[in-house]
């Protein structure tokens, strides 16, 4: 075999256009600068605040308000907090002063203290409300509910709510949390106590009904007595009047006859009525004589 040398003709390799490598590097550098500029901007939306973590000094004490702010990329990182008041319902099962089990639910409207956001992040993190509110609410509810009887929790509900609010506000300050409102939304008791309350209400209703019936009977009795006394007085007055003037009976008879005649006159049938029917047989109308005996 003939040994042939393998030779490469470099003249056949296509050459890159001049400046192509430099142009690609320029585009890459421009993209890096744009990305760097973009990562150095932090937008804080309305109702939010930001704090900055620095890799060298840790959390800065400055709180950034709403708007756009500059940070050093990679060296600094922004943490955004929602500082608007947020509602949260928390339930607790506790005992009252008279040893009744009470299931109470309160609604808490809370928000972080803006000036203390760096301290909140250092000690509690971003889920500060999850860490703090359930524990302090249960603590306060158990201590306050134990001061009242079960019936007082119902009749003095507003006072209990105000006391819970005052105690919770003072306790939440220890964790840099502000409370705008605290209200009792649900208040339930054990089955035995609920049955006892229902039985008591039924007994009270029955007692009220019995009291009403007694009062009504007394009123009816008084009415009958007053009516009887009135009829007796009326009869006595009529008797005295007849004794003094016999013509009173004739006047009453005439009034009755007039009423009978008026009623019969409206009848479509023609009727002929004697004096006896009209009660006029007792005296002479022309001579005004006394009634016949």
From Swiss-Prot:
The keyword Cytoplasm applies. Residues 190-235 form a coiled coil. It comes from the Eukaryota. It is found in: Mitochondrion inner membrane; Cytoplasm; Nucleus; Cell membrane. It is a single-pass type II membrane protein. GO terms for cellular component: cell surface; cytoplasm; mitochondrial inner membrane; mitochondrial prohibitin complex; mitochondrion; nucleus; plasma membrane. CDD domains: SPFH_prohibitin (cd03401). It holds the Pfam family Band_7. SMART domains: PHB. The chain crosses the membrane at residues 21-41. Its main location: mitochondrion. Keywords: Cell membrane, Coiled coil, Cytoplasm, Membrane, Mitochondrion, Mitochondrion inner membrane, Nucleus, Signal-anchor, Transmembrane, Transmembrane helix. GO terms for biological process: mitochondrion organization; mitophagy. PANTHER family: PROHIBITIN, PROHIBITIN-2. Protein with pleiotropic attributes mediated in a cell-compartment- and tissue-specific manner, which include the plasma membrane-associated cell signaling functions, mitochondrial chaperone, and transcriptional co-regulator of transcription factors and sex steroid hormones in the nucleus. In the mitochondria, together with PHB, forms large ring complexes (prohibitin complexes) in the inner mitochondrial membrane (IMM) and functions as a chaperone protein that stabilizes mitochondrial respiratory enzymes and maintains mitochondrial integrity in the IMM, which is required for mitochondrial morphogenesis, neuronal survival, and normal lifespan. Belongs to the prohibitin family. The mitochondrial prohibitin complex consists of two subunits (PHB1 and PHB2), assembled into a membrane-associated ring-shaped supercomplex of approximately 1 mDa. This is Prohibitin-2. It comes from Dictyostelium discoideum. The gene is phbB.
């Amino acid at each position: 075999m003939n040994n042939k040398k393998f030779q490469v003709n470099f003249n056949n390799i296509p050459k890159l256009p001049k400046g192509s490598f430099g142009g690609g590097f320029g585009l890459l550098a421009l993209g890096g600068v744009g990305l760097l500029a973009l990562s150095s901007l932090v937008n804080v939306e309305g109702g939010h605040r930001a704090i900055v973590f620095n890799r060298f000094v840790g959390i800065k004490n400055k709180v950034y308000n709403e708007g756009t702010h500059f940070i050093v990329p990679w060296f600094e990182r922004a943490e955004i907090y929602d500082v608007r008041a947020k509602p949260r319902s928390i339930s607790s099962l506790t005992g009252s002063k008279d040893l009744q089990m009470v299931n109470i639910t309160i609604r808490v409207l809370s928000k972080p203290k803006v000036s203390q956001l760096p301290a909140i992040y250092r000690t509690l993190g971003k889920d500060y409300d999850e860490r703090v509110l359930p524990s302090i609410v249960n603590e306060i509810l158990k201590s306050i509910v134990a001061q009242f009887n079960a019936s007082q929790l119902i009749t003095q509900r507003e006072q209990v709510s105000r006391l819970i609010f005052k105690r919770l506000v003072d306790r939440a300050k220890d964790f840099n949390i502000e409370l705008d409102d605290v209200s009792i939304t649900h208040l339930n008791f054990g089955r035995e106590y609920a049955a006892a309350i229902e039985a008591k209400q039924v007994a009270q209703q029955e007692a009220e009904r019995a009291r009403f019936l007694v009062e009504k009977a007394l009123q009816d009795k008084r009415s009958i007595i007053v009516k009887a006394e009135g009829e007796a007085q009326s009869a006595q007055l009529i008797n005295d009047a007849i004794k003094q003037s016999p013509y009173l009976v004739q006047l009453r008879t005439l009034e009755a006859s007039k009423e009978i005649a008026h009623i019969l006159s409206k009848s479509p049938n023609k009727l002929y009525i004697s004096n006896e029917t009209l009660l006029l047989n007792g005296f002479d109308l022309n001579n005004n004589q006394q009634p016949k005996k």
